[in-house]
């Protein structure tokens, strides 16, 4: 749905683990990266499924492989990266979005390693936007670094996830406040900036751009 926070236009998708089939995708059955929403939509269509909603879901290398941890249908494709490093991904604390059998949650990376939750799907990104109801300590209110951004937050009961794309440029501080203040998400994770893209059948929207790595998708069976 379309929404707004202060002067920032937003697109927000709220999903429920009770009613929505939420998944992560990276490669086709032939082992090639999907790279875009159309390729994923076509493969789903070939399997009597349809793509309801999707967005880029985690940072990736030039070959479209994930920078951090990635798990698909219980299979670990990339191990957890816990060391600090360059760029937004390495701005600790970073985190992992995890899809369980009947729950959804954003974990701080070391918390994830400590608890070892049983995730059907998982994707690591960074930085954390909100951690235990607090904004990331390195975010600056007056920062001039503004980009189109997207991310995910989860509800306290782990039944809902909020996927948000800012349609206007925004700094980290304000983007994190959207999850904390507007959506009341105790934990939220940044996905990306410049390449942020979204697919929504309901909104008749299919953003085009450079090839992407991990893709978050809400999938439905064909009627």
Set out the residue ranges of the language-model regions.
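Short acidic-glycine loop/turn motifs at beta-strand connectors
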Residues: 16-19, 98-103, 131-133, 154-159, ...
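Conserved, well-ordered active-site substructure
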Residues: 67-85, 138-150, 154-187, 196-223
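Zymogen propeptides
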Residues: 1-88
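Short, surface-exposed coil-to-beta transition loops
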Residues: 8, 91-93, 145-149
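Structural motif
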Residues: 51-53, 95-96, 104-105, 127-128, ...
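Short, solvent-exposed aromatic-acidic interface loops
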Residues: 27-32, 111-115, 165-169
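Active-site-adjacent helix-turn-beta-strand microarchitecture at beta-sheet edges
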Residues: 65-139
């Amino acid at each position: 749905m379309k929404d707004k926070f202060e002067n920032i236009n937003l697109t927000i998708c709220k999903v429920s683990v009770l009613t929505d089939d939420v998944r992560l995708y990276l490669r086709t059955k032939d082992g090639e990266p999907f790279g875009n929403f159309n390729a994923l939509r076509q493969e789903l269509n070939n399997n009597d499924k349809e793509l309801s909603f999707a967005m880029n879901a985690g940072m990736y290398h030039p070959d479209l492989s994930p920078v951090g941890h990635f798990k698909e249908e219980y299979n670990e494709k990339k191990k957890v990266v816990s060391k600090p490093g360059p760029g937004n991904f390495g701005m600790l604390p970073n985190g992992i979005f995890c899809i369980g059998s009947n729950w959804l949650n954003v974990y701080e990376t070391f918390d994830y390693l400590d608890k070892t939750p049983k995730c059907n799907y998982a994707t690591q990104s960074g930085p954390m936007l909100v951690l235990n109801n607090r904004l990331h300590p390195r975010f600056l209110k007056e920062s001039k670094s503004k980009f189109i951004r997207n991310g995910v937050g989860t509800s306290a009961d782990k039944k809902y996830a909020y996927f948000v794309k800012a349609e206007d440029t925004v700094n980290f501080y304000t983007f994190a406040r959207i999850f904390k203040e507007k959506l009341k998400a105790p934990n939220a994770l940044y996905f990306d900036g410049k390449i942020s893209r979204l697919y929504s059948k309901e909104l008749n929207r299919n953003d085009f751009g450079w090839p992407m790595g991990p893709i978050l998708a809400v999938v439905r069976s064909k009627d």
